[in-house]
């Protein structure tokens, strides 16, 4: 039974609101390329994303989380548990308000950067700029720049290779039958490895590749090769090639949703778990346990967020940046997953949201600069750079008010 503590009740409500905002903005990215390419309808997308986001959050979300995300401020300098409670509430509200504003305008922003901004905001109000781990902040800023650039370059190169091996051949359907098992198998090596690292929270890249990635890729390669032996109807050869990648794109997008639920639910339930642990046990360590029912609350909030408001960001990423087809959508999912995997292995800071958007831009650039909606890209980039300061300012104001009335 949930203890009847006003701080716990308030934080649960705010945590659910943050999870809803994550679903409406960040989680919508997972299915945006599939919707933009016409692989599935928006209604199908929100249903699939909602189920997989909840599954990822509840069954694969970490049962131990950080009280202060990414060690962005020094927890040893916060000795008063009430400060951590007020700060958690302020960070949640600051991040949630900014996410709702960004989502209203269809701008895909990083939920991790939003909650980090909220934490920095209340941290500076409480302990001054010295409380912030500026080395970590530099890594966060680097991720703003590196993620979209690396995602764009990788997607550009992958799509050029895919276009040369399949779409520009004399018989695209025949080439797709020959080459798509290779491309799809390669994608599932990455997906299998990512499942081990991001969903099962494994620590060894080599174990992930050898035990999960390669076996998954080989199985999918064999199955795809067998399925493609069927004859395609006499249609436009380019459309025939796109059809081959359509169903696969739904699977790759679905994986992104599952992994997102497992990882980013911590942005909503981390502060909730911190307040719950302090209020019920008097503990205020750097890490706290996360009860399953809190994971369920976060997963439910994300799922409802996708279903009720996710269409705005889906439309921006899937339709407004550049025109997408199934091969382009597949390229984006494959490229984003690969870049995130490599970055995790190298210990580089990276934003999945920024990487996906960068990959969309990269695929568009493979067709020429004119294929990109530059005004939309400009608005997105501006929103990325104001995420941390805006969330921080809002959280700082809320924290100051809580200190005055607390």
Curated annotation (Swiss-Prot):
MF GO annotations: phosphate transmembrane transporter activity
Protein keywords: Cell membrane, Membrane, Phosphate transport, Transmembrane, Transmembrane helix, Transport
Membrane topology reported for the UniProt record: Multi-pass membrane protein
Keyword Transmembrane in annotation: yes
Compartments where located: Cell membrane
Membrane-spanning segments: 2-22, 45-65, 83-103, 114-134, 140-160, 182-202, 207-227, 265-285, 288-308, 330-350, 385-405
UniProt-listed InterPro entries: Phos_transporter (IPR001204)
Cellular component terms (Gene Ontology): plasma membrane
Single GO biological process annotation from the record: phosphate ion transmembrane transport
Primary location recorded for the protein, binned into one broad class: membrane
Keyword Protease attributed: no
Entry similarity comment: Belongs to the inorganic phosphate transporter (PiT) (TC 2.A.20) family.
The protein's role, per its UniProt record: Potential transporter for phosphate.
Protein name: Putative phosphate permease PH0640
